[in-house]
Amino acid sequence: KNVYLIGHVDNVFKYFKRGEAFILSSLWEEVGFVMVEAALTNLFIISSNCPNGPTEFLSEGRQGILFENDMKGELSNSLIKYTKLKNIKKNKIEIKKNTKQYTKYRHFLKLKNILK
């Protein structure tokens, strides 16, 4: 119903708690912690299919919706697709499970293996 563009904020959680979905429209993004934060607050994720992060985090679109940034109408088509989804709650649970691989401890283990 309503979309608010509020710019940069230090505490995103107070906004996430009031939302239903999170849209990431970046042209380039590493595994964005903002997506992890959105998943932790049970938001459905709609993201551009930019290099690296979103595709990996959303399991190549199986746990959220990916759209192509450079194709006219893709974002609006993704929003329409979201409104027609039947298992949004199940999908949100699957997205939230992905957050477990992005803890500080997991990053430490990966870095430790790289430095061996």
What are the language-model segments listed below?
Residues 1-7:
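Nucleotide-activated donor-binding/catalytic signature segment of Leloir-type glycosyltransferases, i.e.
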Residues 8, 27:
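Aromatic "clamp/platform" in nucleotide-sugar-dependent glycosyltransferases that forms part
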Residues 13, 20, 42:
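A short alpha->beta transition loop at the rim of the catalytic pocket in nucleotide-sugar-dependent
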Residues 32-35, 54:
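Short glycine/serine-rich donor-binding loops of glycosyltransferases
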Residues 38:
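Donor-sugar nucleotide-binding helix/loop cap in glycosyltransferases
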Residues 44-48:
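Short hydrophobic beta-strand element within catalytic cores of glycosyltransferases
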Residues 60-72, 80-86:
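Conserved acidic donor-binding segment of nucleotide-sugar-dependent glycosyltransferases
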Residues 66, 87-116:
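A charged, aromatic-enriched C-terminal amphipathic alpha-helix characteristic of glycosyltransferases
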